[in-house]
Every structure is written in C-alpha cells, then in structure tokens.
C-alpha cells in the first residue's frame, strides 16, 4: 500500500504542472509517455533473438516525427514507416516481419494517442482532468473493492490478484465519480 501511495504522489507531482502550465511541459509529458510506452510495448517481443540496436530508437523517433509533422504528411509518413519496418527483415535475420508489424502497431497506436491527447487538451483542458479523475477513481475503487470484496478471480494467468468484484467496483465508481 505504501508503494502505491508513493507512486500516486510521484505521478501527481509529474503530471499536474504540465496540465496546468501547458506549453513545452505538456510536450515533455507526451514525449515521456511515448518513450516509456514504446519501451514497454516493444519489449513484449519474444526474446528468441535480440533486435538490432537501432530498431527501438528508430520506432520511437518515427512517432515523434509523425506527431511533430504537418497533418498533410501523416499518411505518407505512416506509409514510409511501414515500408522501412517491413524492409528491415530483408537485411537482417534478427528482425522478422512479425517484428516489423509490432513496430508499425506501436508507431500507429502511440501516434494516434498523442494526437488525440493534444486535440483533447487544446479543445478544453478540463476534459483532460475529467479523464484523469475518472481513471484514478476507477483504479482506486477497483483496488479497494477487490481487496475487501474480491472472491472470484478474473484471470489468474494475466494478473493473479484481479477479481471480478474489483473490476465491477472500478467500473461503477469510475462512472459515478466522473
């Protein structure tokens, strides 16, 4: 419990200033999410062979280029990314077509998330606060409902401590508090 509280406080300290002041701080926050998410997602690859060292930085850089580019270039740039990542297996045995598709999925997903976040933020900053409050309400309620009422495991293979009761409690309180 102490770890959860410390983590929550650190997240609050890191997220609130960018949301309040905007500008380059919000760009830095989005950059952090792109890099952290990229590392997490690209590490999902089965470790049968190590990728060439340039792959992960190239995929992360591709997301930044897309986010910062002119909207008219997005389709062409996504096409170039697909071509590049699906061509790499021709030149190395350590990177396969399925790895290329994983990189393309990462680039597309995080580009879309970053664009959506920026659009929501530019439309009305209060929407971002709404999303944060709903997320924390859902997560906190799920934790406590699962801890005190949880009897039926949700999916032990994915997360051994998650319960149906916690999941339903999280959904309910997330909806009520948002």
Language-model segments: what does each one mean?
Residues 1-163, 167-178:
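Membrane-embedded alpha-helical bundles of polytopic integral membrane proteins
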């Amino acid at each position: 419990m102490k770890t959860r509280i410390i983590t929550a406080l650190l997240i609050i300290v890191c997220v609130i200033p960018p949301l309040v002041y905007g500008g380059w701080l919000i760009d830095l926050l989005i950059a952090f999410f792109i890099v952290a998410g990229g590392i997490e997602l690209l590490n999902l690859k089965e470790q049968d062979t190590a990728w060439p060292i340039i792959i992960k930085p190239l995929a992360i850089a591709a997301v930044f280029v897309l986010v910062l580019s002119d909207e008219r270039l997005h389709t062409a740039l996504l096409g170039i990314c697909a071509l590049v990542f699906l061509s790499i297996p021709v030149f190395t045995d350590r990177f396969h077509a399925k790895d290329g598709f994983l990189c393309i999925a990462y680039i597309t997903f995080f580009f879309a998330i970053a664009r959506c976040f920026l659009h929501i933020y530019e439309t009305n900053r209060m929407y971002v606060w709404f999303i944060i409050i709903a997320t924390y309400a859902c997560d906190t309620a799920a934790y406590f409902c699962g801890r005190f009422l949880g009897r039926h495991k949700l999916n032990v293979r994915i997360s051994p401590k998650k319960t149906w009761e916690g999941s339903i409690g999280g959904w309910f309180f997330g909806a009520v508090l948002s």
